[in-house]
């Protein structure tokens, strides 16, 4: 799907047809307009929930969250993070630095989190980093975050994400507390110098009532 002035889900059914997906990306990406980032991520989760198997959202943007037509019902990164955790959805995020003309700096909702400077590739303008919520939601859900400064790096980054998804391990355990609450989770490796990338919390089931 794509998002800007509106959020579009296309194709209507999930597909692994590479030609179809590339055609959609070329014809429907919306380079101008607002960036309802977290509303779009929420729609992606909603579409994935009924599907069988592992659920992964790949979120790519060159902007910060700006609701546009969704101002009256705008979701925050925390809203989407909570839902992703509850629905067991992993989120990978790719953020691309963008260049804005002088005087048109876009501020993220809630203030803060935006850095930038002048100059760089492509001539004058202001360099804006991607939304600061991207690395947070990726870390919380066990996904990865990649921040790019050049669009030329997109192909290799998408390839890296695909490789990671094909080489993951699934770990499971039976929680001792069945209280229906969210609990912190940490996965550690015994191999020195290695670090696991895993979700930071889990939602325990409720104990059956007699």
Language-model regions, residue ranges each:
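Scaffold/interface architecture of coatomer-like assemblies
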Residues: 1-210
């Amino acid at each position: 799907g794509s998002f800007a002035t509106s959020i579009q889900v296309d194709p209507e059914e999930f597909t692994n047809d590479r030609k179809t997906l590339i055609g959609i990306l070329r014809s429907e990406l919306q380079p101008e307009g607002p960036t309802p980032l977290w509303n779009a991520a929420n729609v992606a989760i909603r579409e994935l929930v009924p599907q069988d198997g592992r659920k992964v959202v790949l979120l790519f943007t060159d902007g910060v969250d700006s609701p546009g037509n969704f101002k009256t019902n705008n979701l925050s990164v925390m809203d989407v993070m909570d839902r992703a955790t509850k629905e067991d959805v992993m989120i990978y995020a790719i953020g691309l630095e963008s260049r804005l003309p002088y005087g048109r700096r876009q501020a993220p909702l809630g203030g803060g989190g935006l850095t930038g400077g002048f100059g760089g590739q492509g001539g004058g303008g202001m360099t804006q980093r991607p939304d600061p919520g991207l690395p947070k939601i990726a870390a919380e859900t066990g996904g990865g975050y990649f921040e790019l400064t050049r669009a030329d790096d997109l192909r290799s980054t998408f390839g890296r994400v695909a490789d990671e998804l094909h080489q993951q391990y699934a770990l499971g355990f039976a929680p001792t507390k069945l209280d229906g609450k969210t609990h912190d989770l940490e996965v550690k490796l015994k191999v020195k110098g290695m670090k696991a990338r895993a979700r930071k919390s889990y939602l325990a089931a409720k104990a059956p009532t007699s």
